[in-house]
Amino acid sequence: MLFYSFVWSVLAASVALAKTHKLNYTASWVTANPDGLHEKRMIGFNGEWPLPDIHVEKGDRVELYLTNGFQDNTATSLHFHGLFQNTSLGNQLQMDGPSMVTQCPIVPGQTYLYNFTVPEQVGTFWYHAHMGAQYGDGMRGAFIIHDPEEPFEYDHERVITLSDHYHENYKTVTKEFLSRYNPTGAEPIPQNILFNNTMNVTLDFTPGETYLFRFLNVGLFVSQYIILEDHEMSIVEVDGVYVKPNFTDSIYLSAGQRMSVLIKAKDKMPTRNYAMMQIMDETMLDVVPPELQLNQTIQMRYGHSLPEARALNIEDCDLDRATNDFYLEPLIERDLLAHYDHQIVMDVRMVNLGDGVKYAFFNNITYVTPKVPTLTTLLTSGKLASDPRIYGDNINAQLLKHNDIIEVVLNNYDSGRHPFHLHGHNFQIVQKSPGFHVDEAYDESEQDEMTVPYNESAPLQPFPERPMVRDTVVLEPSGHVVLRFRADNPGVWYFHCHVDWHLQQGLASVFIEAPVLLQEREKLNENYLDICKAADIPVVGNAAGHSNDWFDLKGLPRQPEPLPKGFTTEGYLALIISTIIGVWGLYSIAQYGIGEVIPNDEKVYHTLREILAENEIEVSRG
């Protein structure tokens, strides 16, 4: 009896100390110039950009009111990346944020309340729009959960966001990307990289003091390196998980990943300042335009009068030294989940469909948004919630039993890197292959031969006794990764590539975990129902919006039909470029009859010919 009295007194004290953070934000377009080179519309809160970082403590409550203040037809939603929204601790899945997965989009004029507690997590997280590629236009910020009992000491704390930056609006870039005129699926090349939403940054250091740097890659696409000149970092936290200190001078962060490091300043005043390098992962870019700056130098300044650090070149840096997260170990020892109850094998592919667009696939299925949020379908379907048919055949629904150990195997039949993020859980990384054939040039038709899929009977490396735990992991080119987690958080959890261009291509799945138990814990609240009605989205029904017959999927959005047999990406490219050349020819004839020949005509022609030659396609000038 005394024990229970003690427990309840501790809980009561925790509740008494917890704070409630009431935040009111209106999202709208604001004009900004993050890189100093190009003014554009960014997404601000309350008329300001960058968005504020949110700092809370473990056990605090957040009440964030998000109002859609866009004056156009832009809808939005907000996700708190890495937060479990654990329903067993009183939170609601309706607070997770991905549009048409766990909520309806917030249309202009509507307000949605994100109301949750953060009782069991600490560390570095972030919040961002989860609709289209919106957060690339700045709708993002750090979300830091401070721990009164941090297992390390430091004198100063700095939150550092890394991101790629596009000069064009995300809607324009997405439209050009998902187009038959981009049949190779080449990802949009950013125009710059940002360090804390800007460039040309100087960081002040005091001799003898220790700094906690919380690095977050909040970009849409490109992974980034951070490299220190003549300084060392001690990695102490990854994706909200404390790790045993690991010393390095270089780290690697994909989109969505976070890493906290301790940096010890020089003991005595040095004779010069030093460099911190921020470098794009060039291997993720199909082409590198000559005007693209792949890196920038951040000054680590000890004194205003000291000589500045020289700008380092990428050639000066050994990128292979970046820490491999597979070999990190959680500070709180967690043994390997030694077996699995349910295995999900997902083959990642990029394929053109009949509309000429290149889509991303898990097991030959590309994610297509349903007419009703998946959470709505689950919570209004009664006993049918455990039947995968009601969720449609284009969201890659995976039904998981409560407390089962789940193994997810990802095989990469693509030549690019993919950072995968799971909502609602961390996972153990039990196998992670290197990339294969990264520097080789080979035809797309040879990809299956180049890929090294996971062989359960002959894993490439021993299973770690205490695997690294995080929520976002990089799948290497032509390689594989194996993840395990316990399905102990009932919900509708999005699993997707955090290269947002790949998410727009459909590289996503939905893990529907313990649906009957979730029905017992959660009901759709009035605010949820109101924003759905405002968006003209049904508040009951299957993926197609039908509730009279739950297995009637008539009208469900589906992926386009496949290309005709034998019609390749190269063939499509030849058709498009030949058409362009033909149109160019007709245009030139018309121009010749009415005025001077356009000076750049010959340049356009030769550029198109070069593209054809690179793809080994022959087209006569005609």
Swiss-Prot record:
Residues 43-146, 192-301, 392-514 form the Plastocyanin-like domain. InterPro entries: Cu-oxidase-like_N, Cu-oxidase_2nd, Cu-oxidase_C, Cu-oxidase_fam, Cu_oxidase_CS, Cu_oxidase_Cu_BS, Cupredoxin, CuRO_2_Fet3-like. Cu cation 4 binds at residues 418, 497, 502. Its cofactor is Cu cation. The keyword Methyltransferase does not apply. Pfam families: Cu-oxidase, Cu-oxidase_2, Cu-oxidase_3. Cu cation 1 binds at residues 79, 421. It comes from the Eukaryota. It is a single-pass membrane protein. Cu cation 3 binds at residues 130, 423, 496. It is an enzyme of class 1 (oxidoreductase). GO terms for molecular function: copper ion binding; ferroxidase activity. Residues 595-622 are cytoplasmic. Belongs to the multicopper oxidase family. Interacts with FTH1. This is Iron transport multicopper oxidase FET5.
